[in-house]
Every structure is written in C-alpha cells, then in structure tokens.
C-alpha cells in the first residue's frame, strides 16, 4: 500500500495497482487476535461502531421470528407463537452469558471461543428451518430452541468441563425463563434435530417425497445410525 503495488511471485515483476479502495473490518486485539500496527492503520479512516444494545437486538430478532411465524403455510397454536418474546430474550441472555462468563473466555488453547452477532443470528436461522410439521406443542418448540443454541454455542467447546458448564446454563435458563424441568422436557439426549430421515417424521409418514424437508427431532438413534451408514 505504501508503494502502490507489489511484486508478482512468479515473474518477479512489480505490478502497479491503481483505482483501488481498501475496506476492512476488525475486532479489538483480544482473545488471540493480533495487534494491527499504527504504521498500517495510518492508511485508513477508522470508524468505530458501537455494539447493539439488548433493546436493538430484541427488535431485530423479534421481527425475524415474527416474520417466520406469519409466513408459515399454516398458523401455529397460540401456545407456540406466544413464546416469541421469551425466546428472543432468552437467546440474547444466553449469548451474553457465553460471551462474558469467565469459564468460557478465549485462551491461547481455546482461541476459537469467540462469539459475535453472526452466531446469535444462526440460532434464529436454525429455528426458521422448521415447518408446521416440526412441532405440535410448545415443548417441541422449546426443544428446537435448545437444540439450535447447543449447535451454535456448545459445539465449539472442546472440553467436557466447558460443555457441562454450558449445559447447566441452558438448563437453568429453561427452568427460570420457561418454567420447564429439563429432565421432564428432554427424553433423549443429546438433542438431535435433522431433516434427512423421512421415516422418523411426525405422523409416521414414510413418504420422503412428501416430507423430505421436515426438520424434526430424531429420538430413535438406532434408526439414525442405520440411515447414516446407508448414506456412507
């Protein structure tokens, strides 16, 4: 950038670059991220973006979940749609706790323990994969929410201790925010939702053609294992 170009590695010739604008984004140098030198930063106009507050996050993801409910082919029971605000609040709360808990802070050995809004949005992206046939009660919807949170946050954790810490966070939140006992809600652990086993879809419908896109809980692990071997 100082000299207006760079050398070609193959021909060793200097290539002049003209009419180029550099746009970059970065986070503060913590959690394994390197410091960017002032010598390099002097080429840029720095713009700092304040993090979204919880009220803004609630509005953003609340609208996404509301859009999802409205655009389903068939209306869901009120007992499920009434969970919207609590689901959004709980997801933001869990995201904040995972980010700030000293037990899950990034270290040199766990430098990937970094979460951002992209991870938060993926929870809702997973929820919106479900269809009317994915759940028939609010308990099914809560299990879907817990599954998506586990896939986004827990799957990144590399030690049993860290995974147990997250499990306790999720169970406590389920009891406090939704008044559900985890052991009574989840009969088969770990939670597993997918859309690749048509014989396990709701209503015992074995028509892969009709319901090949149903994203639902898979409780028969032997059938899951058998289907995975078939795909191999």
Question: Could you say what each language-model-derived stretch is?
Answer:
Residues 2-18, 30-36, 74-78, 109-110:
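Conserved Walker
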Residues 18-23, 27, 42-45, 52-232:
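Alpha-helical lid/collar subdomain of P-loop NTPases
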């Amino acid at each position: 950038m100082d000299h207006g170009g760079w050398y070609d590695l193959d021909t060793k010739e200097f290539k002049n670059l003209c009419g180029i604008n550099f746009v970059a984004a970065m986070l503060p140098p913590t959690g394994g991220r390197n410091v960017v030198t002032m010598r390099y930063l002097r080429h840029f106009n720095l713009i700092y973006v304040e993090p979204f507050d919880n009220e803004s996050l609630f509005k953003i993801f609340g609208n996404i979940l509301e859009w999802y409910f409205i655009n389903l082919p068939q209306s869901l029971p009120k007992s499920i749609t009434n969970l919207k605000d609590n689901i959004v609040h709980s997801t933001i709360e869990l995201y904040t706790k995972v980010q700030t808990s000293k037990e899950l802070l990034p270290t040199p050995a766990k430098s990937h323990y970094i979460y951002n809004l992209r991870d938060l949005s993926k929870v809702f992206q997973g929820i919106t994969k479900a269809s009317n046939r994915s759940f028939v009660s609010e308990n099914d919807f809560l299990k879907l929410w817990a599954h998506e949170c586990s896939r986004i946050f827990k799957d990144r954790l590399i030690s049993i201790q860290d995974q147990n810490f997250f499990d306790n966070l999720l169970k406590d939140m389920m009891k406090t925010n939704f008044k559900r006992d985890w052991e009574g809600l989840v009969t088969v652990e770990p939670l597993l939702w997918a859309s690749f086993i048509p014989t396990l879809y709701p209503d015992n419908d074995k028509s892969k053609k009709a319901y090949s896109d149903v994203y639902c809980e898979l409780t028969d692990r032997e059938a899951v294992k058998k289907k995975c071997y078939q795909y191999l």
